[in-house]
Each structure stands twice: as structure tokens, then as C-alpha cells.
């Protein structure tokens, strides 16, 4: 099982590096913009958003959240709103700032999207897989120190994990990267064209994409395959809509 985790990590890393290399070669993206996109993701979602979660949700040491147990619908709405608010506002702030420095270019949207989505892939994809590798290795060797830290439900989940679920996790991260690129286009166009309905659309589209995983998190959507199918269909739909709206306008 652990070998499949390693393969998935290698594939994700290769996909990310390959995407950046291709974008740099074909579209001459600015690597500084890419780096700032990564910084914007880290500050908005890993610092500011998590700080709000701590203040509002009061997560316990074991990771449990009272709102998730008591009112899952409100928890979903809160999670969707916070993720969209922080990440899309980070895009807005960045492009407004960049616009004051110089004229915006099409490649800026691609560069920022790869930076923002790329670091998300690392944090939510590679980091999760590394943690899973460590825990799974400890369970297989019956490491007593780690076994004591695992709840019964978590232990059952790990022991029942299938190979295809590991690759499915990698597939979801690739879909998420694609969606981050599309969302960046919407905010970029909002700033460039001064049409703030595009910004509102970006907030809504972000929540739209996060809905299926949120439903799965609270147990209302139990099929991992169905979640990924929904995400893939959403990505195709939004990509088509984005191209139809902006292809001739950009």
C-alpha cells in the first residue's frame, strides 16, 4: 500500500513541475507572480482562514468540532463561505496591487493560478499523502506510540483503505489545480475589466466546487467516486463557461 502512496506523490509532483515548465516555455509566465500566488494562498488560507476557524469553531485537541456534530448544514455553509472569501479576496488584492505596478497580462492569471493552486496541491495533496504514509507504516508495524494516538474510527478507516482511493486523492488534487486556474481567470478579468460581477461569480464558483467534498465531510455524500465524478463534471462545465465568456474578451 505504501508504494502506491509514493507513486501518487511522485505523479503529483511531476504533474505540478511539468505544468509550470510548460507554462513558462509556452506562455513565458512570470515566476515572481507564480511565487506571489503561492504566498497569497499560504497567507489567506493557511494563516488567516485557519485563525478564523480557531476563533469560531474552537476545534478540540482530537480534531473534533462541535458545530460539525450539532449542525452540519451550518458547518457546510460556514466552510464554503470562508474558503471562497479568503482565497478569492487574496486574488483580488493581488491583482489590484499588481495593476498599480504595471499593466496586467494574460500570463499573470496563469502564473498566479499555478502558484496558488500549486502550493495548495503541496499542502493538501503531498502533505496529506506523507502523513498517510507515516501513519500507515506505523499501523503495519504496530507501532505502539502511534497506535495509542489513533481513534478507533480512524484506525478502521486506515485499515480499510484501498489502493484506488489513494490514486483518487491524487486525481482530486489535479482537478483542484485546474479549478484554481479557472477561478484566477475570473478574478483577473474582474480587475482588468472592472466588472465586479465576475468577482462575485468567482466567490460562487469556489463554493460550488467545494460543495461535494463538504457534503462528503459531514457524511451526506458517502461515495468517494461520486464526489470525484461531480468535481470532474463541474470542472468541465466551468472551463466551458469560462472559455465562452472570456475567450473573445480577453
Predicted regions and their residues:
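Hydrophobic alpha-helical segments at protein termini of multi-pass membrane proteins
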Residues: 1-250
Amino acid at each position: 500500500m505504501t508504494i502506491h502512496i509514493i507513486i501518487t506523490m511522485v505523479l503529483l509532483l511531476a504533474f505540478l513541475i511539468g505544468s509550470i515548465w510548460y507554462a513558462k516555455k509556452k506562455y513565458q509566465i512570470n515566476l515572481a507572480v507564480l511565487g506571489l500566488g503561492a504566498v497569497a494562498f499560504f497567507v489567506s488560507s493557511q494563516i488567516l482562514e485557519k485563525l478564523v476557524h480557531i476563533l469560531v469553531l474552537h476545534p478540540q485537541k482530537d480534531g473534533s468540532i462541535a458545530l460539525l456534530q450539532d449542525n452540519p448544514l451550518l458547518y457546510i455553509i460556514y466552510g464554503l463561505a470562508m474558503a471562497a472569501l479568503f482565497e478569492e479576496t487574496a486574488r483580488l488584492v493581488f491583482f489590484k496591487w499588481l495593476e498599480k505596478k504595471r499593466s496586467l497580462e494574460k500570463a499573470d492569471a496563469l502564473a498566479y493560478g499555478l502558484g496558488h493552486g500549486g502550493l495548495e496541491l503541496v499542502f493538501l495533496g503531498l502533505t496529506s499523502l506523507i502523513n498517510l504514509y507515516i501513519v500507515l507504516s506505523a499501523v503495519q508495524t504496530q507501532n505502539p506510540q502511534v497506535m495509542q494516538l489513533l481513534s478507533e474510527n480512524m484506525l478502521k478507516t486506515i485499515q480499510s483503505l484501498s489502493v484506488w482511493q489513494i490514486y483518487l486523492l491524487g486525481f482530486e488534487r489535479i482537478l483542484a489545480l485546474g479549478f484554481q486556474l479557472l477561478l484566477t481567470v475570473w478574478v483577473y478579468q474582474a480587475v482588468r475589466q472592472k466588472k465586479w460581477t465576475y468577482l462575485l461569480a468567482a466567490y460562487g464558483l469556489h463554493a460550488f466546487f467545494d460543495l461535494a467534498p463538504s457534503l462528503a465531510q459531514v457524511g451526506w455524500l458517502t461515495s468517494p467516486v461520486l464526489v470525484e465524478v461531480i468535481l470532474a463534471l463541474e470542472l468541465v462545465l466551468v472551463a466551458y463557461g469560462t472559455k465562452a465568456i472570456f475567450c473573445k474578451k480577453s
